[in-house]
Amino acid sequence: MSFDINWNQLTIDDTINQSIKEFLDQQFKKISLPSFISNLSVTDFNLGEIPPEITIRHIGDPFEEFYEDEDNLGATNETNHNLNDERSTMGKSQENGIHKDNAYNSQNFDDDDDDDEGVDEDDDDDEYDDHDLGTINEGISLLNFNDSSTTPSGNSFGGSIAPLPPPPLNPSRDSFHSILHPYGVNSIIGATGAGSETPTNILNQNYLSSRVLPKISVKQKQPHHDDNDIQLIVEINYKGDMHINLLVNLLVNYPSPNFISLPIKLHITDIVIHSIATIAYLKKSVYLSFLCDVDDAFPDFDSNNNAQTPTSTTGGNFVDYYSNDAAINKERIDIVKKIKIESEIGEVENNILRNVGKVEKFLVEQLRNILRDEIAWPSWICIDMNDDGDDDDDDEVEDSNVSDGDGKDNDGKHGDGPTHEV
């Protein structure tokens, strides 16, 4: 199944470009820069006029991770309620014990009273022990819930699954390929409507862990399920004219630190992406996360040269970076498979230094790292499509819930259009 995208409606408002530019600029400013560059900033971003090719592979319910805050909030409230009940019960037991002690001291010490007192103490202990064991069981259930995976494989795709014991935690967030369809991604992509293989089992919940929380979200996660929520598993093939402009200073630290500072303008273009992604629509918010890359042969790779790892060109003002090393790609999703950088140092007419491959390679690696960390599963990015009037109702919730990975509040809103938060 395929559909056409009205790309002009997405790019006609520059608010989206501005929002993405500011988001990328914030991420680049968090990078620890090497000694030979400084003052890195994103000066421009544009989605371009060429849309990606998107093919729908499955339609179903959104992943439960998008609603995880609701469950955690309910579990936390239940735990606090049980804790308060336990404290209240313990307080009443202590008050009863004080009254009994006073009554006991006012009576004569005889054998019958001693026996009655012993029975009363045993009854109190039994009552407390039963309540204590109940609390332990509830804690174990809560622990199992928190440690178990929450990404549905059957439920999210309209199927049903039998209750399973909590699986062991996945020790690495870089092994998403292990939870893909057992016949491989290529089998899913190559499957036809008449074939027996479908993308229903593209995800296996037994290998996912909810302990890795996403890093980017406008409202973090949706607090409530809605009947209109929907999720698409899609194949994205992009070879468009998106471009990113960066500005950075190249430093010469000899004979002294920062002896010479040269401004470098970098133009990132020719971005190639071929991946499987999930797009979820939840209450006027769009969630996007890349699940895995699609392994295919790019003609440009084979026609250029037979080298396994191409090197940057010298003597020119652009350089291509890409890798066809299967061992590297299997370890982690790349998202960006090919990219080109054009560089300018100083004034264009006085451009003397051309070989800045070291700076370019560093920036490309950092760009890939940002995309992997922020929009590759189990992380995602959320675009809020709500109007300002709708947002007013949720301001109090957003102010209390939205924070970055360091616990700092960040509303992250840019203009009146879609917003991004960290």
UniProtKB/Swiss-Prot annotation:
Residues 74-134, 387-422 are annotated as: Disordered. Residues 1-386 form the SMP-LTD domain. Residues 405-422 have a biased composition (Basic and acidic residues). GO terms for molecular function: lipid binding. Residues 109-130, 387-401 have a biased composition (Acidic residues). It is a peripheral membrane protein. The keyword Chaperone does not apply. Transmembrane segments: none annotated. Keywords: Endoplasmic reticulum, Lipid transport, Lipid-binding, Membrane, Mitochondrion, Mitochondrion outer membrane, Transport. One of its GO terms (biological process) is mitochondrion-endoplasmic reticulum membrane tethering. GO terms for cellular component: endoplasmic reticulum membrane; ERMES complex. Coiled coil: none annotated. It is found in: Mitochondrion outer membrane; Endoplasmic reticulum membrane. The keyword Mitochondrion applies. Its main location: mitochondrion. InterPro entries: Mdm12, SMP_LBD. Belongs to the MDM12 family. Component of the ER-mitochondria encounter structure (ERMES) or MDM complex, composed of MMM1, MDM10, MDM12 and MDM34. A MMM1 homodimer associates with one molecule of MDM12 on each side in a pairwise head-to-tail manner, and the SMP-LTD domains of MMM1 and MDM12 generate a continuous hydrophobic tunnel for phospholipid trafficking. Component of the ERMES/MDM complex, which serves as a molecular tether to connect the endoplasmic reticulum (ER) and mitochondria. Components of this complex are involved in the control of mitochondrial shape and protein biogenesis, and function in nonvesicular lipid trafficking between the ER and mitochondria. MDM12 is required for the interaction of the ER-resident membrane protein MMM1 and the outer mitochondrial membrane-resident beta-barrel protein MDM10. The SMP-LTD domain is a barrel-like domain that can bind various types of glycerophospholipids in its interior and mediate their transfer between two adjacent bilayers. This is Mitochondrial distribution and morphology protein 12. The lineage of its organism: Eukaryota, Fungi, Dikarya, Ascomycota, Saccharomycotina. The gene is MDM12.
